[in-house]
């Protein structure tokens, strides 16, 4: 049927995608999901320290917390990877109020609340977003 025909652009895109997966090192570095899944515990700890420093520079208290990052999805619904998160101290706010303020921003910041802590799991946060997160957290807590 016509609905199943592939044009040259679709074939080229499929070829490029499959070629990227053939080089495991390239794939782990350049494909965002694979880069996140393959990040080592040491890399994540260093990343969490960098976010914590930016938060401190913005006047936000936080602590590092070791986490179990859920891989999720249909292929690995119960799999966890050891990771690191930055737990923001909410100041005068409750954890739920901090979560709501940051989630309702024009560019939402989505975190996880676990054991009454607001956790920013660094495995899935791009470093180029750290400064914006620190500024938003400082604004929310003020």
Q: Residue ranges of each PLM-predicted region?
A:
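Conserved C-terminal alpha-helix-loop-beta "cap" of PLP-dependent enzymes
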Residues: 41, 45-126
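Catalytic-site microenvironment of enzymes
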Residues: 139-142
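Short phosphate-engaging motifs
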Residues: 10, 94, 129
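Charge-rich, low-aromatic oligomerization/scaffolding segments with amphipathic character
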Residues: 129-136
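Active-site C-terminal subdomain of aminotransferase-like
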Residues: 1-53
């Amino acid at each position: 049927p016509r609905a199943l025909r592939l044009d040259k652009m679709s074939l080229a895109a499929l070829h490029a995608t499959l070629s990227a997966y053939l080089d495991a090192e390239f794939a782990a570095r350049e494909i965002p999901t694979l880069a996140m899944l393959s990040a080592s515990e040491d890399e994540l700890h260093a990343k969490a320290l960098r976010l914590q420093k930016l938060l401190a520079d913005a006047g936000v208290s936080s602590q590092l917390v070791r986490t179990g990052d859920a891989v999720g999805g249909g292929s690995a619904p119960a799999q966890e990877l050891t990771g690191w998160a930055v737990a923001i101290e909410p100041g005068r706010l409750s954890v739920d109020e901090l979560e709501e303020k940051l989630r309702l921003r024009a560019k939402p910041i989505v975190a996880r609340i676990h054991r009454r802590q607001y956790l920013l799991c660094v495995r899935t946060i791009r470093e180029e977003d750290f400064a914006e997160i620190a500024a938003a957290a400082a604004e929310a807590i003020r």
